[in-house]
């Protein structure tokens, strides 16, 4: 049985769907603070629980025969991490330590973790590979980096293997506007409501946008692999915000022009991640280009 923490959330629910499609038994644990039961696959088992509560975790591991954990329960907002770093660190670092202790006690074989490009900070060179310097600019990035190291420390003394997946900017159906790839959800919500869309600065800043179903496929492959590794999960393609806006206009039928505002303080100018590592190790490669991914995303938001 595979435990997906945060399985009622944006990314976790898509991973749950992909695992169930491959006939895996899936248990979802979620505290529903940001996730929704509407996202839960009906074939998954569900336990309401919080990773910061050791009693909740102990109850789950004691009752269910968990072979692998796919950890996606997290505080996902960079802004929240800066406003309330203690909350961020408690959820993201204490939470993962609680989980890892249970994995050690109950002899879990595999641990897959959702990390982030936020651990790298401002790019020193592009594309960013896994050896790029780590200089997070937020407590969110810091908590992801610390979580990675927690996994490696626990894995030293156990038979558990791990996959640490550093995501680029993930977008797709079920996304809320708060997360890292949130610009797509922000634009989608505003376009569907026919409200103004705001672009900070000149819109020439670039990001690596990856569709959530490609992320889910990478997680399935990572769970099925038995080697410990750390890898970027990305498209290796950069897209500027103006181009993103124009593709989204086309897919939603939105007719307004973008409103340009002041650049946001601390925003990274350009970012995209090299993905040859995961491609070579797992034969994974993204199947969705931006146009195809945004088309599916627009269909979801238009009918939500």
Label each region the model flagged.
Residues 146, 150, 154, 187, ...:
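Hydrophobic alpha-helix immediately C-terminal to the catalytic Tyr-X-X-X-Lys motif of short-chain
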Residues 192-304:
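C-terminal substrate-binding subdomain of Rossmann-fold SDR/epimerase-dehydratase oxidoreductases
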Residues 52, 83, 91-94, 131, ...:
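Residue-level signal for the nucleotide or nucleotide-sugar donor/cofactor binding architecture
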Residues 1-170, 288:
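N-terminal Rossmann-like NAD(P)+-binding domain of SDR-like oxidoreductases, especially those catalyzing
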Residues 172-173, 265:
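Short beta-strand->alpha-helix junction loop in the catalytic core
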Residues 55, 67, 79, 86, ...:
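Residues in well-ordered alpha-helical elements
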């Amino acid at each position: 049985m595979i435990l997906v923490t945060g399985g009622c959330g944006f990314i976790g629910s898509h991973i749950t769907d992909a695992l169930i499609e491959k006939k895996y038994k899936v248990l979802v644990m979620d505290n529903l603070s940001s996730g929704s039961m509407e996202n839960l696959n009906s074939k998954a088992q569900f336990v309401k629980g919080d990773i910061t509560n050791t009693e909740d975790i102990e109850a789950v591991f004691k009752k269910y025969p968990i072979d692998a954990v796919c950890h996606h329960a997290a505080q996902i907002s960079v802004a929240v991490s800066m406003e309330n770093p203690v909350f961020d660190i408690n959820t993201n670092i204490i939470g993962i330590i609680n989980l890892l202790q249970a994995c050690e006690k109950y002899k879990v074989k595999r641990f897959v973790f959702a990390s982030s490009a936020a651990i790298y900070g401002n790019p020193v060179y592009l594309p960013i590979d896994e050896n790029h310097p780590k200089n997070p600019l937020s407590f969110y990035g810091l908590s992801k980096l610390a979580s990675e190291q927690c996994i490696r420390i626990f894995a030293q003394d156990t038979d558990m293997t791990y996959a640490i997946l550093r995501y680029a900017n993930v977008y797709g159906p079920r996304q809320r506007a708060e997360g890292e790839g949130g610009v797509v959800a922000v634009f989608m919500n505003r376009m569907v409501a026919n409200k103004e869309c705001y672009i900070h600065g000149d819109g020439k800043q670039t990001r690596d946008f990856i569709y959530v179903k490609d992320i889910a496929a990478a997680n399935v492959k990572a769970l099925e692999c038995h080697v410990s590794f750390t890898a970027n999960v990305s498209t290796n393609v950069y897209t500027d915000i103006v181009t993103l806006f124009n593709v989204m206009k086309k897919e939603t039928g939105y007719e307004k022009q973008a409103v340009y505002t002041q650049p946001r303080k601390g925003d990274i100018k350009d970012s995209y991640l090299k993905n040859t590592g995961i491609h070579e190790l797992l034969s994974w490669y993204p199947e969705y280009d931006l146009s195809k991914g945004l088309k599916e995303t627009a269909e979801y938001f238009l009918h939500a």
